[in-house]
């Protein structure tokens, strides 16, 4: 009987010792895991605070440290700046070294050599089909032309705002717009858009669904058209699909790393009257000079004031990003 009791006590003591050993081992392992996790967290925090190498790494543009914008005449580290200008500008200047000269002038305003990019486009209409705004800050120079005033306004609305867009299959489906921020945006070499509003029985309102000629034309031979129809009503859409695409888009808000500078014209284009523009601020400015050298000199002089009303953003804009931005 005593042998059985001694055996039971011995087994109990061994179990306690074994359990104590297991608990100490688990504690050491947990301490190791926790300390490693804290070390990695501190290291990542230091890196992401030092430079923009973290999870929000920009798709394009520089990875320079972000500095507060300043209007003071002191040199500070900046990010990339893209300057978009029409072919007319380089033709009038007619100087093979004009970009290098301007780069040196930007350097005096705090923009290091190599941080300013000059991008030429042929005309407003062609530029609107495939805008490529890749820099941290983007300035688009638009020469005012009364005959292109509406095209300029639509382009400004496109590039000064962010849009979430999805493709539309107008051959199979009817579409309706859900609110003021919902627009259809068509792009291509030649876009002619016609619509036929439908009642609840899918019969045409003032048009015949089987007769395209009876549809209402809302865009003709355009390269960019932002289409707005009556909300909450289905529409049958006819489109020149061989030369144009159309997307169902929702305006998300201002694209704050883009500004438009209008060259000439009696009045600056105003897109803030659009109820979907919120907040009611615009990054559009006007300079009145006949010579392009004078235009560029003015931009260099006021570049830091211009950038101050902008905000560095990580999103880029090209035709693909515009159509499928997530």
Swiss-Prot record:
Residues 165-167 are annotated as: CNP motif. It comes from Rotavirus A (strain RVA/Human/United States/Wa/1974/G1P1A[8]). This is Outer capsid glycoprotein VP7. Intramolecular disulfide bonds. Gene3D superfamilies: Glycoprotein VP7, domain 1, Rotavirus outer-layer protein VP7, domain 2. It is found in: Virion; Host endoplasmic reticulum lumen. GO terms for cellular component: host cell endoplasmic reticulum lumen; T=13 icosahedral viral capsid; viral outer capsid. Its main location: virion.
């Amino acid at each position: 009987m005593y042998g059985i009791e001694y055996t039971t006590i011995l087994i109990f003591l061994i179990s306690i010792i074994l359990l104590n050993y297991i608990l100490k081992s688990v504690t050491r392992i947990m301490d190791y895991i926790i300390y490693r996790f804290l070390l990695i967290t501190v290291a990542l925090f230091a890196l992401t605070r030092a430079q923009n190498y973290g999870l929000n790494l920009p798709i394009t543009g520089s990875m320079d440290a972000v500095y507060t914008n300043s209007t003071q005449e002191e040199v500070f580290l900046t990010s990339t700046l893209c300057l978009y200008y029409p072919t007319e500008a380089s033709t009038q200047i007619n100087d093979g070294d004009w970009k290098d000269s301007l780069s040196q002038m930007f350097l005096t305003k705090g923009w290091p050599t190599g941080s300013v990019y000059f991008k030429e486009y042929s005309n407003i209409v062609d530029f609107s089909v495939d805008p490529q705004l890749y820099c941290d800050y983007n300035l688009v120079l638009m020469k005012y032309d009364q005959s292109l005033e509406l095209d300029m306004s639509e382009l400004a609305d496109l590039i000064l705002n962010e849009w979430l867009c999805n493709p539309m299959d107008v051959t199979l489906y009817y579409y309706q717009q859900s609110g003021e921020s919902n627009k259809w945006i068509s792009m291509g070499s030649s876009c002619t858009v016609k619509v036929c509003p439908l009642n609840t029985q899918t019969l045409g309102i003032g048009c015949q669904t089987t007769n395209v000629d009876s549809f209402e034309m809302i865009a003709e031979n355009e390269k960019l058209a932002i289409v707005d129809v009556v909300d909450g009503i289905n529409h049958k859409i006819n489109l020149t699909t061989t030369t144009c695409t159309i997307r169902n888009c929702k305006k998300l808000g201002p694209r704050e790393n883009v500004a438009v500078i209008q060259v000439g014209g009696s009045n600056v284009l105003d897109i803030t009257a659009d109820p979907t523009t919120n907040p009611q601020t615009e990054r559009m400015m006007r300079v009145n000079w006949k010579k392009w050298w004078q235009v560029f000199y003015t931009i260099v002089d006021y570049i830091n004031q211009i950038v101050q009303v902008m905000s560095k953003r990580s999103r880029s804009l090209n035709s693909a990003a515009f159509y499928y931005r997530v």
